[in-house]
């Protein structure tokens, strides 16, 4: 029997809708990504974090992929304010955390500091090029960081995905109700095609259940929109997966595109949701050619199994082999690449937007139909909206 222990040993809960807001005399405006982070800290998804990073923890995370106490943590979770706003704030202040006029939380300010963004970019993203979407977001943010413990006082409106939002305490309860002792998490910002289905089902052979946890926070403009992806996941699970072995729930964080570091981060978060295993494929959380194909797998070697507390499952690039007449990878298929059905994400998106159905050896026809319909509807609406 295997049981997932929250990262750091305790599932953090910073939710208090009755917090006395009149104690918070200052105000900080959040970005959409910071709002997501606030809620994920508050609900324990980012355990052991209890707030936005202070300089001591920030420096440790950027330089060592650990918090100052040595706990594995690879992505800096920060709250940025302008120089003008920073002049209004002082250590010891309590500030309301506001998004579009609504107060979602309070921070007890423990630190105000100016990060070295170039250093953060080079160490976290492995580049300081503004062409990298994560780096661009980093440099677009204000130049001062505010650290301190938070209290979550209001939950965000989950909209059309409301029935798929689950806090870590809820997923842990669900997995226990299902009788799942071992659960594998799968992170994605893309539709699930045959290659993803193959590695998920390979993982399902050795665990009790699959937690399909697609990211629905901020992504790149050319990524498939979340609403279309969610419909495609549902039709795939309905037609091709055992219903008692899979659980679908969304992950509201913004995409960082930090490649290897984000793979560690995604694993730690799924550990908090109750997963005992986590799938790491090729170029996990990558973008462009900034990371090596399997860098996101190699980075796990920097930590012991005990430090991670979740078992990464590494998979090589998968494809349909016409000679094997089935899904395979370079580990299991001896045939030449000319027998492999491989399409780039860019090529597939182009086909779908043009109404072309990818081969069934690449994508399930039901999934392709949903994606084509959704993208074409989006295209007809988009020109008038631009």
Swiss-Prot record:
InterPro entries in UniProt: ATP-Sase_PUA-like_dom, PUA-like_sf, Rossmann-like_a/b/a_fold, SO4_adenylyltransferase_pro, Sulfurylase_cat_dom, Sulphate_adenylyltransferase
Q: Does the keyword Ubl conjugation apply?
A: no
Q: In which pathway does it act?
A: Sulfur metabolism; hydrogen sulfide biosynthesis; sulfite from sulfate: step 1/3
**Disulfide cross-links:** none
> According to the lineage, what is the superkingdom?
Bacteria
* Residue ranges crossing the lipid bilayer per the database entry: none
Stated EC number for the protein is 2.7.7.4
Keywords carried by this UniProt record: ATP-binding, Nucleotide-binding, Nucleotidyltransferase, Transferase
**Listed GO biological process terms:** hydrogen sulfide biosynthetic process; sulfate assimilation
Q: Which reaction does it catalyse?
A: sulfate + ATP + H(+) = adenosine 5'-phosphosulfate + diphosphate
Which enzyme class, named as a word? transferase
Tell me the GO molecular function terms.
Answer: ATP binding; sulfate adenylyltransferase (ATP) activity
Q: Which family does it belong to?
A: Belongs to the sulfate adenylyltransferase family.
> What protein am I looking at?
Sulfate adenylyltransferase
Native source species = Geobacillus kaustophilus (strain HTA426)
Gene name as annotated: sat
